[in-house]
Amino acid sequence: MMEGRGALKTVLCFGDSNTFGYDPIGMAAGDRARYPFETRWTGTMQRLLGPGWRVVEEGLSGRTTVHDDPFEPGLCGMGALACALGSAQPLDCVIIMLGTNDMKTCFGLPASDIARGVESLVLAVKRFPWAPGCRRPSIVIVSPPHIGEGIRDVVLSSFDMRSVAVSHEVATAYRVIADEQGCAFLDASEICEPSPVDHIHLSPEGHGALARALADVVVSLAGQ
């Protein structure tokens, strides 16, 4: 029997390496791939929201919105979304923070197409066949942090300066999608910036700032 919608509220965080909690310093040192749960924005948000909430992490490094990576299989967000929704339901809120990996040079996508990928995920959430006792969750679209310009000096990077430019353009396109689809919106680039270590991934301070901002959004939606 499906769990009813009781007092406990559940938030699904669907994203890429910055939801997984990729640790750029630990990776550079070769001793840790992931921040501890209490450092990741998902873990910090769990603490801020308190015992009446359950935060479900669904972050995967390299995940795209709707595209198959030609070099590494299994990274298409659309291909993983239904399983994530089904296993975590009932849900009160779904946070989608994807798009950075769509900016890779192998895709060459403009900001508008990346935003359409996010829109496809939003529509998939809305159309998901929720079990009895579940109603459609609210949706938060998060435009990802900018890619740092230092990426130009990274050897064999999957990103280039065009990727940096697109990372500065997607927030406008994401906001349009959020308005059209009736979703909440947060521009993470206004809150946090990538680590100077690899110019892509968040520092612990960035995770904390993002957690505080998203906790406010989630609580606000719960009160509606």
Please state what every model-predicted region is:
Residues 56-64, 192-193:
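Short connector loops at secondary-structure junctions
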Residues 63-73:
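Phosphate/nucleotide-donor binding subsite
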Residues 2-59, 69-70, 84-88, 94, ...:
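Serine-esterase "nucleophile elbow" of acetyl-processing enzymes
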Residues 18, 25, 62, 101, ...:
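Residue-level marker for beta-strand->alpha-helix junctions and adjacent short loops that shape enzyme
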Residues 21, 63-65, 149, 195:
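Generic structural signal for helix capping and beta-alpha/helix-loop junctions
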